[in-house]
């Protein structure tokens, strides 16, 4: 997934997209907190233990597998989006229409960004894994970090990392604090309805509230001056921008242009589905067919024509992640990546147990 600061910024930019229905744009403008919640909703499970994850990140350790995040990104992601919109519209409680629509706009911005930028993130991460070794998830996170850094510098002239503004960005519910894992009751109910509609089960409310609080801890950490110094250091590195953002092979903004088109399409489809108030199986099926939401982690597995519509990227050599970019039958990496395959199988088994 793109970096959290990019997801949050892109979610907040829904209000400025001229092609999106005015009611949805207004909702995202009026309810920035719930827009940000929707924009980061898919990734919240990754923040279950912020201190441990920060240590792992600093040590360059592989990212932890998180079954709930894997489900939302790769196990019927289109059904989860349909369930999320239905829950936003129907969950009882004192939620205003704009609050409900802001959740929808934020979530669809996340989907649009993943579907259009993840192919580029995956390419860069696998390129660097091939060239430098190490675990792909480490290179994946670095790629996301530099994409977000140079995007913010190009678009806004400043990086939000290391600034007090980012503490506010990381507030994604209206209750709770850095200390208390507390979320307003209607949002907890909405969360559980969204998960259950797609998967039949949901995280415990206290667990999910802990993820929300932990995300605020993340916001506090990356708003500190030490994060600003690191950002300034990376901005002065002449090798990073041409490697990750713009070179003879790709331009980040060519992919980002697709993100803006996709978010307009998805937000209008999502608004129509929300506004119609029909959440029957037939209506959900119609929304899913129109939205064409692919695997968010590996776009193109379900709708290869949408992947083909993105700017082209070179095919990596056969020494790459199995089953992703390598031609079928070419398996010189087999022994090297056997452990990776076993990890994937264990992760899939955990997801099945959750189901």
Q: Where do the protein language model's features map onto the residues?
A:
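N-terminal leader/auxiliary helical segments
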Residues: 1-106, 111-355
